[in-house]
UniProtKB/Swiss-Prot annotation:
It comes from Dictyostelium discoideum. GO terms for biological process: tRNA export from nucleus; tRNA re-export from nucleus. Pfam families: Exportin-T (PF19282), Xpo1 (PF08389). This is Exportin-T. Keywords: Cytoplasm, Nucleus, RNA-binding, Transport, tRNA-binding. Mediates the nuclear export of aminoacylated tRNAs. Residues 435-503 have a biased composition (Low complexity). Residues 435-513, 1059-1088 are annotated as: Disordered. It is found in: Nucleus; Cytoplasm. SUPFAM superfamilies: ARM repeat. It comes from the Eukaryota. GO terms for molecular function: small GTPase binding; tRNA binding. GO terms for cellular component: cytoplasm; cytosol; nuclear envelope; nuclear matrix; nuclear pore; nucleus. Belongs to the exportin family.
Length: 1088
């Protein structure tokens, strides 16, 4: 071993010291860059037996060919080529080399091939083919070279320059002319005469990569196809055979040729010949079926398009081919393995999509989708009756597959709603009758907290009647529904649906003669119909309303809900809630059976935590959907929930707090929307709120929160936040404002206020009592937001006391933001009525905002702190905007706040117009809107004219209206910037209206000349600033003027606008006098 070999070994030896390794790396690197490196490495390649040394030498060749090939002389290039071919002939083929060496040699030769083939080495393939021998590694190396040519020349997986793409195309064309026939012949010889599975697999890999761009007849013929079929029966090579068929079918060609090719291949017979004894192989075969079927569908669609354009029909057997693939589709789609089923899902989906475009389905097509519905049902069935929190990979894959199957089912439903409705009705009837028969001797389930009143019990004996009603309603669907795609096939649809057999029942575990998965999937498909119905006609929707209503009644009165299977319970409640609104108004007595299932041990008292939680959540949704229909049952619901409403850790071990919130919200909506007699409403509210209010008052009065520590997990403080939450959440059902017109309700209808006022008295104390707890403050704001709607005008007198308390405790930016949201809500709701409250509080609030913004250390870019500061700036400007929008602009001009207006507000608005950085556009837009409102309000003739405002207009506002859009940061292609420019146009027009000739003279003689604007354009400005001109014309002129100044192309069809394109377009906005300079952050330190 010489120094060279040692150096290479040292480079890869982890046990060598770092010093020696660095010396070795330096030595080998010097060899790589030497001018004669190729010659040195060629000599060493023929002498060494060390794999690392061989690899190094080949790597040197690769780098030279890639990066320094043009530096070699013609003689050096020829010697390099000859040397590599000699090494192949004398050494490589006669020794058992590592795969890494074989692959690296193939890569090097292909790089050399790309450089030399077209001009100097047209015999490349002849040279290698002449050296192929069955007794050595030559065939192996040649196949690797062919594969590497695909990677370097053909494959589109790598980004290539246009020049390289052109060269590669030329190489392929030359290969087609001179070499491909010989290469294909060599593949055939290998497949016929060699029994080595690795060689056969490599040959098949070559074929599948080349078949896409060579003459297809070279492969699809009587020589190759029988060989493929032969090897399809050989387990170790059949995967590659299957992939070859896929690539053959995937080859781009016109639709007639594609169908002829598929017919010639006889895929159906090939697949029937294969031994489908392995799941992985079945997936490959399924992928072949999937691709073949999709290609047939696409080809038939293309042929149909050509026919419409006047082409004669040239191919009659396409439908026969499609039928063959569909039969294979049904077979593989219904396979026990979901992976096999999914391999043909694309074909099933595409076929159904194609059927959606057919107006009238034939009998065969109806049979197809009927069978698909049954297969979808079979494949959707759960293997386990529980949903685990930590799903394994197989569970996640099944959930994803189920989503795809659901989408397929909904599309089938949209094609033939009456057939699917009949199929679902048959399934529901079967599972209901089965469960009812098995449970007829069992006692009806009782509520965990007692029997629900007689209103609910009256309907227990109606199961059989409503089961019989399913068929009646299904018949109504068939009689009344007009199928969007097929008006004449209802009878056939129903007949086919009723004839479907379950193909997989033998694998199920029985549960009282009925698998839980059968029950669950039948209800689940009924649920999915609601997703699909939205895309059908209004007539179809109406015809199904009665059907859905009857399904709800039957399910709720059946024994299905009495189950220990989690997945059945969950889909049962989901489906009930989805369709409960379709229970006919004259059959509302059945709602009692619906409610009963929610309120007893099937629902909110279920032993399964997930079912309990879901039932509570869905009961809340049901209360919002059907609050009017549920009014008669309020007392029963309260009784069923009474233990669940207690706020205590013991109860929350069984009923988490989030679920308790759902119950409070449900009851709030029911009671608040019931229009109950005053005494009855008060009784119900007392039942629900008395305990939380008393508990809150007790904790405050006894100062129990002071004993909280980490050890007791802040027991009482947490309880206080929960109590605020439940009272506030319950209040969502109550409002002092009429929902239809927004007017205040008479006091006689708002007697509930006493309970919320009483709660407010306690809650407003908490920020002062527990000032360090941010959750308490946050929940207090939540409650205050609710009180704006709940108390209405009764809240206003309390705000004088409440607002200072809340502001005092807004010590962090997050809480200050919450305060501003609440403050803006008050302004929006009460408007000018709130003047006496806003006027004294405005200055302290603005001061608090400025102090929070004046951070000594700027926040880290893109951090939460920066986000919070940006949000605070936005909230500040939204506050100023709200004052103008809701007739409270006079608060800024009051004696108390006028200094604030001049010293801070004006300057911050100007700064906001010049804002830069992230999200600055939104701040700029708001600030220009504010400027326009200031001009309207504070200029002469405005409702709140301000002395000295004129100087502000001329010194700052007008220059700003040109400076901002002319700045480099202003992007004319941005939508928000366009909106800002429109606002600027409005402001300038408003100034012209308020200040008249004085302003027009200023523009004519001072501002526009400073911008080097021609007199012609100045005249257009003056003309379009007149109130008599359309404002849109002025906004268009301004936009085009700014574009011209920025050197952007301008174009307008407006005849009133004519900009002189020879005008100086240099950006002279620096000439504009800007006395309102800020630091670009919108709101400046100290308000300047």
């Amino acid at each position: 071993m010489d120094e060279f070999e040692k150096a290479i070994i040292y480079c890869f030896d982890p046990n060598v010291s770092e010093d020696i390794k660095q010396k070795a790396l330096a030595y080998t690197e010097s060899i790589k860059v030497a001018p004669e490196a190729w010659l040195f490495c060629l000599e060493r390649l023929g002498k060494t037996q060390i794999v690392l040394v061989k690899f190094f030498c080949l790597q040197v060749f690769q780098e030279i060919i890639l990066h320094r090939y043009e530096t070699l002389s013609k003689t050096d290039r020829l010697n390099l080529r000859t040397g590599l071919m000699n090494w192949f002939r004398l050494y490589l083929v006669n020794n058992q080399e590592e795969s890494a060496i074989k692959n690296k040699y193939a890569q090097v030769m292909v790089l050399l091939f790309k450089q030399e083939y077209l001009e100097n080495w047209l015999t490349f393939f002849d040279d290698f083919l002449s050296m192929l021998s069955p007794g050595n590694s030559s065939i192996d190396i040649f196949l690797r070279i062919c594969k590497s040519i695909d990677e370097e020349v053909v494959s589109f997986d790598v980004h290539r320059s246009p020049a390289e793409l052109a060269q590669n195309t030329f190489i392929k064309d030359t290969m087609r002319e001179n070499a491909i026939t010989k290469i294909v012949a060599s593949w055939y010889e290998i497949l016929v005469h060699h029994q080595s599975p690795p060689l056969i697999n490599m040959t098949l890999q070559n074929i599948k990569t080349y078949v896409g761009w060579i003459d297809i007849s070279l492969i699809v013929n009587d020589k190759f196809i029988p060989l493929f079929c032969k090897y399809l029966g050989v387990r170790v090579v059949r995967d590659e055979v299957c992939d070859c068929f896929k690539e053959i079918i995937n080859k781009g060609m016109d639709p007639f040729a594609k169908l002829t090719l598929i017919q010639q291949l006889e895929i159906k017979n090939i697949i029937n010949f294969a031994q489908l004894d392995d799941q992985e192989f079945n997936i490959r075969v399924g992928a072949l079926i999937n691709l073949t079927g999709m290609e047939i569908l696409r080809s038939l669609e293309s042929i149909q398009t050509l026919q419409q354009e006047g082409f004669d029909k040239k191919f009659q057997s396409g439908e026969i081919l499609l039928e063959e693939m569909l039969q294979l589709l049904f077979r593989f789609f219904n396979n026990e393995s979901n992976d096999v089923s999914y391999s043909v899902y694309g074909l099933a989906s595409l076929y159904v999509q194609k059927l959606k475009n057919i107006k009238v389905l034939n009998e065969k097509q109806i049979q197809h989708i009927t069978l698909l519905v049954q297969i979808v049902r079979n494949k959707m069935r759960y293997k386990t009756s529980r949903i685990e929190e930590d799903d394994d990979e197989s569970d996640i894959k099944f959930a994803d597959f189920r989503k795809d199957l659901s989408n397929l089912f909904r599309n089938i439903f949209r094609i033939c709603p009456e057939m699917v409705g009949s199929f679902i009705a048959t399934n529901i009837q079967r599972i209901v009758e089965n469960k009812n028969n098995n449970n007829k001797n069992k006692n009806t389930t009782n509520s965990k907290n007692g029997t629900i009143n007689n209103n609910i019990n009256k309907t227990n004996n109606n199961n059989n009647n409503n089961t019989n009603n399913i068929n009646n309603n299904t018949n109504n669907i068939n009689n009344n529904t007009t199928n969007n795609n097929n008006n004449n096939t209802n009878k056939n649809n129903v007949k086919n649906a009723n004839n479907i057999k379950n193909n997989n029942n033998e694998d199920e575990e029985d549960d009282d003669d009925m698998s839980f998965s059968d029950i669950e999937v039948s209800i689940y498909l009924l649920f999915q119909m609601g997703e699909g119905i939205s895309a059908t006609s209004e007539e179809t929707l109406k015809s199904f309303e009665k059907f859905f209503g009857s399904m709800v009644v039957v399910l709720s009165q059946s024994s299905i809900s009495i189950t220990e299977h989690q997945v059945v319970s969950l889909i049962y409640f989901e489906t009930i809630v989805r369709y409960a609104k379709y229970i006919p108004m004259d059959e509302q007595q059945y709602l009692s059976s619906v409610l009963k299932s929610f309120l007893d041990e099937r629902g909110i008292h279920n032993k399964d935590a997930l079912v309990r939680s879901k039932a509570g959540y869905l009961l809340n949704k049901l209360a919002k959907y059907l609050k009017v229909q549920m009014f008669p049952y309020i007392n029963d619901i309260i009784d069923a929930l009474k233990n669940h409403l207690i706020i205590s850790y013991e109860i929350q071990k069984e009923v988490p707090f989030e679920e308790q919130l759902n119950f409070y919200e449900s009851l709030g909506f029911l009671i608040g929307g019931a229009n109950l007699p005053i005494e009855k409403e008060a009784l119900y509210i007392e039942k629900i709120l008395n305990n939380p209010i008393i508990k809150m008052e007790e904790i405050i009065a006894k100062q129990l929160y002071k004993g909280d520590t980490k050890e007791n997990q802040f027991y009482y403080t947490v309880q206080l936040t929960q109590l605020i939450n439940v009272i506030g959440t319950f209040s969502k059902g109550f409002s002092s404002f009429n929902a239809t017109n927004g007017q205040l309700k008479p006091d006689a209808y708002c007697t509930y206020k006493v309970y919320f006022k009483r709660s407010l008295e306690s809650i407003i104390q908490l920020p002062s009592l527990i000032p360090s707890n941010e959750d308490i403050k946050s929940r207090t704001f939540f409650y205050m937001h609710r009180m704006v709607d709940v108390l209405g005008k009764d809240l206003k007198p309390l705000l004088v006391k409440i607002l200072p308390i809340l502001l005092d405790h807004a010590t962090t930016i997050d809480i200050l933001l919450e305060f501003l949201v609440f403050y803006n809500q008050l302004i929006s709701k009460y408007k000018e009525e709130l003047f006496d409250v806003i006027n004294p509080t405005l200055c302290p609030i603005v001061d608090r905002i400025y102090k929070s913004l004046n951070t000594t250390i700027p926040p880290v870019e893109h951090s939460d702190a920066e986000r919070a500061l940006n949000d605070l700036k936005k909230s500040y400007f939204q506050l100023i905007q709200a004052l103008f929008t809701h007739n409270l602009a006079s608060t800024l001009t009051s004696t108390l706040n006028l200094p604030l207006l001049f010293q801070q507000v004006f300057n911050t608005v100007i700064g906001g117009c010049q804002a830069s950085g992230s999200h600055s556009e939104s701040i700029q837009k708001v600030c220009f809107v504010i400027l326009k409102k200031m001009i309207d309000d504070y200029s002469p003739g405005g409702p709140h004219a301000v002395n000295g405002f004129q100087s502000f207009i001329y010194d700052q506002v007008v220059p700003l209206c040109f400076q901002v859009p002319l700045s480099d940061q202003f992007n004319m292609s941005d939508f928000t910037s366009t909106q800002i420019l429109l606002e600027i146009g409005k402001s300038l027009r408003a100034i012209a209206q308020k200040y008249g000739d004085e302003f027009l003279t200023y523009m004519n003689t001072i501002l526009l000349p400073k911008l080097n604007v021609s007199q012609e354009v100045i005249n257009q400005f003056i003309k379009l600033l007149q109130p008599s001109s359309p404002i849109k014309d002025f906004q268009e002129l301004l936009k085009l003027f700014i574009r011209q100044k920025k050197g952007l192309p301008i174009k307008t069809s407006n005849s009133n606008i004519n900009l002189n394109n020879n005008n100086n377009i240099n950006n002279n906005n620096n000439n504009i006098n800007n006395n309102g300079h800020t630091n670009g952050n919108g709101v400046n330190k100290n308000g300047h």
